[in-house]
Amino acid sequence: MILTIDFTDETNEVAAQHTELVEKLLQHAASVESIEPETEVSVTFVTNDTIQDINREYRGKDQPTDVISFALEELGEGEMAVTFEGMPRVLGDIIISTDRAKEQAEEYNHSFERELGFLAVHGFLHLLGYDHMEPEEEKVMFTKQDEILQTFGLGRD
């Protein structure tokens, strides 16, 4: 196991099989990205109301979204990287709205599992520094995302 993943289900509705799917998929993504062993990440499942509150507070957008990531290694202006020898690398937090995942699965006509996996990988790649603000960045991130999902078996039908 490469990643230590701390799961929190604030909805109390996520089935064990879905948590296991996300666990296996993120382990696969970590392998594809050559992440060092004992790296930590947290995944929290929330409702649309909760993610809307987070989106409003941290992004200034008063609406629900599907996934938000908080990268602990992302440095702000003037900040210096601090590392502690012998301590595990902590990537950050992935927060997924299961309500939005269900809505989007229906909207895009694919399974809840595929959407949940997509959102987990999308959030994970953000923790690693991938972004999609510029067209070239988007191409790189979405290509990597598709590769991970496809090789895991959750590609588009």
From Swiss-Prot:
InterPro entries, per the entry = MetalPrtase_cat_dom_sf_prd, YbeY, YbeY_CS
Recorded superkingdom: Bacteria
Cofactor(s) named in the record = Zn(2+)
Q: Name one GO molecular function term.
A: RNA endonuclease activity
Return the cofactor note field.
Binds 1 zinc ion.
Family, per entry:
Belongs to the endoribonuclease YbeY family.
Name assigned to this protein: Endoribonuclease YbeY
Organism this protein belongs to: Lysinibacillus sphaericus (strain C3-41)
